[in-house]
């Protein structure tokens, strides 16, 4: 999620399979802090629209995954917010205990710090 230049996102898997997860980070929303998960793959053909104000992350479920992002605004790395993937408050059940994380994901903050 970006503080400045918020984005709607459209996610499509061109190759492979991912578990895609979003969390509602809109403070005035009835579903604030709730998450939603969906499996996207090249075989099921599902795509996923993510509105502004949602945190977004995914887990690759196959050895090779190619994911296409469509965004309504430019990426602004300085305004990106990363929340800890296994924040206990979010109660997201990931199918792995020790995922391979990017440097950015390793530095995620608590959801309560947003």
Features from the language model and the residues they span:
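Basic phosphate/pyrophosphate-binding loop/patch that engages nucleotide-derived ligands
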Residues: 61
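Non-catalytic, conserved peripheral segments adjacent to functional cores
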Residues: 1-46, 64, 71-114
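Conserved SET/PR-domain catalytic core that frames the SAM/AdoMet-binding pocket
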Residues: 42-58
């Amino acid at each position: 999620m970006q503080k400045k230049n918020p984005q709607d996102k459209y996610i499509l898997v061109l190759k492979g399979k991912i578990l895609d997860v979003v969390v509602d980070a809109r403070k005035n929303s009835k579903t604030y802090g709730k998450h939603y998960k969906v499996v996207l793959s090249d075989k099921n053909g599902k795509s996923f629209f993510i509105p502004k104000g949602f945190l977004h992350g995914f887990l690759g479920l196959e050895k090779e995954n190619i994911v296409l992002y469509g965004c309504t605004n430019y990426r602004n790395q300085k305004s990106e917010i990363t929340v800890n993937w296994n924040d206990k408050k979010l109660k997201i059940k990931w199918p792995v205990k020790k995922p391979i994380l990017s440097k950015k994901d390793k530095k995620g903050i608590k959801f309560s710090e947003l």
